[in-house]
Design a protein with these regions (language model features):
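N-terminal helix-turn-helix DNA-binding core of bacterial DNA-binding proteins
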Residues: 4-45, 67-80
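Intrinsic disorder/low-complexity segments
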Residues: 44-47, 109
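Amphipathic alpha-helical dimerization/coiled-coil segments
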Residues: 1-5, 23-27, 77-115
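A generic local structural motif
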Residues: 8, 58-59
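Short, hydrophobic-biased segments on the C-terminal half of alpha helices
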Residues: 53-54
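Alpha-helical residues within the helix-turn-helix
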Residues: 40, 57-58
Length: 115
């Protein structure tokens, strides 16, 4: 992933309304949520919601699909996971800290003890 794309995605998620929208879509799961439901649940005016969704679509974090007259927003988990991986891929690589001081689990891969 390029630094510029990561920065753009993080900047868009840095806005409280867009972060609330994205978190709601993540809660809805891979099948997404109707735009009208997002508007009702989050209490965001339609024009404002459209603007913020457009920004998230623009950086690839959200996809829109139409089913007849109903518009759905789907979180792009692949793009979000790619962004998270970019943030954590260098975790503790330049550190002489013990494994105990590095974040556990998916934030870093286990170091090999082979030399």
């Amino acid at each position: 992933m390029e630094l510029e794309l990561a920065a753009k995605r993080l900047a868009e998620l840095g806005h409280s309304t867009r972060l609330a929208i994205f978190r709601h879509l993540v809660r809805c799961g891979p099948s997404g949520c109707r735009v009208g439901d997002v508007q009702r649940i989050l209490g965001i005016p339609a024009s404002t919601l459209s603007h913020h969704i457009g920004r998230l679509v623009g950086v690839g974090l959200v996809e829109q699909q139409r089913d007849g007259r109903i518009l759905y927003c789907l979180p792009r988990f692949d793009a979000f996971n790619e962004t998270l991986a970019y943030l954590t891929e260098e975790c503790c690589k330049g550190s002489y800290a013990s494994d105990a001081s590095c974040p556990p689990g998916p934030l870093r891969k286990k170091r090999s003890n082979t030399r």
